[in-house]
Amino acid sequence: LAPRAGGAVRAASRQVTRKSAPSGRLTLPGKLSDCLAHDRSGTELFVVEGDSAGGSAKQGRDRSRQAILPLPGKVLNTEGLSLGKVLENKEISDLITALGCGAGATFDIARMRYQRLVLLADADSDGHHITTLLLTFLYRHLPELIRQGRVFLAVPPLYRIDLGKETYWAADDADRDRILKEKQKGNAKADITRFKGLGEMMPKVLWETTLNPRTRRLLRVEIQDALETDRIVNELMGKDPSARFPFIMERAEQAEELDV
């Protein structure tokens, strides 16, 4: 059974690699809006949560260097799954195809079609969950992308704060409170808007706050303690709910608000 299963994984991996080969015929995912640059240097693949947000990102991006791949629907939790099983998921398969570097035994980072992979999800708890699912996949099945510093998280705003003629963008509640404390003077009224999702933003706003290399924030994903990271991913994303209970209870007092 083991050799047969291994053969199935290699066959599935080769199938994806052929579709994502950087030379010869290239069949890219239909939802991918690729960038125009032929040189990989400076290029970025943004994996965006949902078709609506993907549409805004496609309109607001720098077409020369930024590619957009919307991921509709629920992202697969790949923790504990074999690569063969993972490749049956269309969203994950499309991502591997777009990246071009293959997976498993056929993985080759030199064939990656972009300099950076950027995960872009809503700034709320749902968006954080989707980001966690994608990071789980990358950590388990494409870990070299993380080790080589090629994976980043975009930081879209959760709030827009208008104070007089000035506009500020806050990534979370703490950022909002900091801005109000530093910028609000006297009885000046603050007009605060909470975004429901990326799809609610106009393309120009998404560019100015999240896509523009001159004004955005990007967080590089790093693995500082391999053993501890492996334990946390297994406990939080694995099938055993009892493994998550101690983690949640240890941090219960840190939760001031629940975004439900």
Which ranges hold each PLM region?
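Conserved, well-structured core segments
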Residues: 44-49, 119, 196-199, 208
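GHKL-family ATPase ATP-binding module
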Residues: 1-74, 107-109, 116, 218-260
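An acidic- and aromatic-residue-enriched active-site/binding cleft used to recognize and process polar
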Residues: 51, 73, 123-126, 156-158, ...
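Charged C-terminal transducer/switch regions of large nucleotide-driven machines
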Residues: 11, 29, 133, 144, ...
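N-terminal assembly/transducer modules of large multi-domain enzymes
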Residues: 1-7, 120-129
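N-terminal start-of-chain detector that recognizes signal peptides
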Residues: 15-21, 39-43, 88-92, 125, ...
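Metal-dependent catalytic core segments for phosphate chemistry
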Residues: 41-111, 129-135, 139-153
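Short hinge/gating elements
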Residues: 15-16, 31-34, 75-82, 116-124, ...
